[in-house]
């Protein structure tokens, strides 16, 4: 399958891919953060920063980013077996029902969008139960010739922005405090991307029991703004 080769265009495609206006519903998920606030674990910006940095370095860097790299390589080489293997591997790494459903819903929404944006390879994933955000994100990155290193940082930055947006509503944080938190997260995002891209297969894997517990308890939380 052909890819675009204009570097400037690839950069703008990436901006579109991580834009908060992308119609995939990511804003409706907090990945357990809502329960963590409700339980009193996160009361201020410093606590939120610790929560986010822990996930960056102990979950996203050893799980999502190396899997993203392998999915990207699989799409580039048209290796359908590898695409499905790493998609299933990622799904197995999602520790709760809510986290699995979040990944599937957002992934299927991105599949529908990419199909409508003239990436026909996305079409079979619209109803695929193992469709996930990383799988379809990797497809777009491969076909739009976005450099993997830049795409990995952007992947983490989009996650971070979504989490900070949720924290602003839930803690609550002021808008300036939210922007200060994003400023603080810029360096850890780059470090986590580099860490994840350097991992060998046998080094992949990680998780945070606190996040898994928060996500599990969120399923029965009485009053909720977010779907996870």
From Swiss-Prot:
Signal peptide: none
Gene Ontology MF terms: nickel cation binding
Location(s), subcellular: Cytoplasm
GO CC, any one term: cytoplasm
Gene3D superfamilies per UniProt: Urease accessory protein UreF
UniProt keyword list: Chaperone, Cytoplasm, Nickel insertion
Domain of life, source organism: Bacteria
Major localization class: cytoplasm
Quaternary data: UreD, UreF and UreG form a complex that acts as a GTP-hydrolysis-dependent molecular chaperone, activating the urease apoprotein by helping to assemble the nickel containing metallocenter of UreC. The UreE protein probably delivers the nickel.
Main function: Required for maturation of urease via the functional incorporation of the urease nickel metallocenter.
Entry similarity comment: Belongs to the UreF family.
Name by which UniProt lists this protein: Urease accessory protein UreF
Classification lineage: Bacteria, Pseudomonadati, Pseudomonadota, Gammaproteobacteria, Chromatiales
């Amino acid at each position: 399958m052909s890819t675009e080769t204009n570097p400037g265009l690839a950069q703008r495609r990436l901006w579109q891919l991580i834009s908060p206006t992308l119609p995939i519903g990511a804003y409706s998920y907090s990945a357990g953060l809502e329960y963590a606030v409700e339980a009193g674990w996160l009361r201020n910006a410093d606590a939120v920063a610790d929560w986010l940095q822990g996930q960056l370095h102990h979950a996203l860097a050893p799980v999502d980013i190396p899997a993203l790299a392998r999915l990207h390589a699989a799409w580039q080489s048209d290796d359908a077996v590898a695409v499905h293997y790493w998609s299933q591997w990622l799904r197995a790494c999602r520790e709760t029902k809510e986290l699995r459903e979040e990944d599937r819903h957002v992934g299927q929404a991105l599949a529908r969008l990419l199909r409508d944006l003239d990436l026909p390879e996305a079409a079979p994933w619209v109803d695929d139960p193992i469709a996930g955000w990383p799988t379809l994100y990797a497809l777009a990155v491969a076909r739009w010739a976005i450099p993997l290193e830049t795409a990995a940082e952007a992947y983490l930055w989009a996650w971070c922005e979504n989490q900070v947006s949720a924290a602003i509503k839930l803690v609550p944080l002021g808008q300036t405090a939210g922007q200060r938190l994003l400023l603080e997260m810029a360096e850890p995002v780059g470090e986590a991307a580099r860490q994840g891209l350097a991992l060998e297969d046998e080094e992949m894997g990680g998780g945070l029991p606190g996040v898994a517990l928060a996500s599990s308890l969120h399923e029965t939380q009485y009053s909720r703004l977010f779907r996870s």
